[in-house]
Each structure stands twice: as C-alpha cells, then as structure tokens.
C-alpha cells in the first residue's frame, strides 16, 4: 500500500463535511492509496508548511500532497509571501526525499478571489511544473461561472457531490504518480 500525507486547509479537510467525506477519502475508494488527511480549516500556507516541517511522518510515507492559498488570499497575504511558503515546502521535500504533489487552487465562484487564485495558479505552474507533480482538478468542479456557482456551498467550499467528483477525478492521476 502507498501512503500520501495530505496537507492543506479546509479544502483538504473536507469542510463542512469532515475528513471522512473529503475528496481525499474518495481517492482511497478508487485506489490502493491511504490518504493521510492533515487538512486544518482556516490555515494559511505558512501555517501548513510549519506543520509539514515540524511533525515527523512515518518512515513509510514517501509522498506529500499540498493544497493551500485560498485563506492567504482572503487574509490579504501577497503572492510573493505565498510563493515563498511553497518554495520552503519544495526545499523541505527535496531535503527529505519526499515526492511532492501540488494541487492547483480551486477556482471559486467569487470573481475578486479568482483574480488572485489565477495569479497563484499561474505562478505555481511557472515555478514548479518541472519540479513537482501539479494536479489541476478544476474539470471536476466546473470551468464556467455557472458551473462554479452550482458547485460550491459558499463560493469556496465544494458541495458533497463535488468533493466526490474531485476524488474520482484525482484518483487515477494520484495512483499513477505514486507508482512512478
């Protein structure tokens, strides 16, 4: 069995439904991967990276998945600061020989936030596309504004069915990644 330590905010945790109903739990249903869900609601990238670096993972964990940035944007953190956190995460994974998967930001139902999320997404792609496995699950959420409005409870957090769709979409891609 393969293990992935999944770090992030409420979008990893599965808010408001909880980890048992998150998209990471759905990945487990479709693969032979145990998804260790370390998502905590409300955290910014600096908090999440602190936890990644501070707490030792079991020796059998070789893969780290990371999703963050929405709370940073909501709290007014600058793109440079967020990218510094991602660089610290990448450097840590290199140092400890972890394979890194970065889940690209979920585009929301809020246009102001989307401007910032799209900037973050572009910067992540530019900086890490050759260094880490980048996974974009937006197809499972919806690409157009109408689909996104129907996909979210509050403009940011997916409905239960969308978490399920994200997990089903991500499962074969994550399975292929851990088998490399």
Task: Briefly describe each language-model feature range.
Residues 1-41, 46, 52-60:
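Serine-esterase "nucleophile elbow" of acetyl-processing enzymes
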Residues 14-16, 110-180:
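Catalytic His-Asp segment of secreted/periplasmic serine-dependent ester chemistry enzymes
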Residues 17-20, 46-84, 102, 108:
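Oxyanion-hole/transition-state-stabilizing segment in secreted/luminal serine hydrolases
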Residues 31, 96-97, 128-131:
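Helix C-cap/helix->beta junction micro-motif
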Residues 37-39, 104, 136:
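Residue-level recognition of beta-strand->loop/alpha-helix junctions
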Residues 52, 86-90, 121:
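Generic structural signal for well-ordered alpha-helices
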Residues 57-61, 96, 177:
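Glycine-rich phosphate-binding loop signature in dinucleotide/nucleotide-binding domains
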Residues 67-70, 89-119:
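Active-site segments of SGNH/GDSL-like serine hydrolases
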């Amino acid at each position: 069995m393969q293990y992935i330590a999944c770090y992030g905010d409420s979008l990893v945790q599965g808010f408001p439904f909880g980890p048992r109903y998150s998209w990471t739990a759905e990945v487990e249903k479709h693969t032979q991967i145990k998804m260790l869900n370390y998502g905590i609601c409300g955290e910014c990238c600096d908090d999440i990276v602190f936890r990644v670096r501070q707490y030792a993972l079991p020796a059998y964990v070789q893969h780290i998945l990371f999703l963050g940035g929405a709370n940073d944007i909501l709290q007014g953190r600058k793109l440079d600061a967020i990218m510094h956190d991602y660089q610290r995460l990448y450097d840590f994974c290199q140092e400890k020989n972890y394979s890194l998967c970065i889940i690209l930001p979920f585009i929301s139902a809020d246009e102001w936030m989307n401007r910032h999320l799209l900037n973050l997404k572009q910067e992540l792609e530019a900086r890490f596309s050759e260094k880490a496995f980048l996974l974009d699950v937006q197809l499972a959420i919806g690409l157009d504004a109408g689909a996104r409005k129907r996909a979210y409870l509050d403009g940011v957090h997916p409905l239960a069915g969308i978490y399920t769709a994200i997990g089903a979409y991500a499962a074969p891609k994550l399975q292929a990644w851990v088998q490399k």
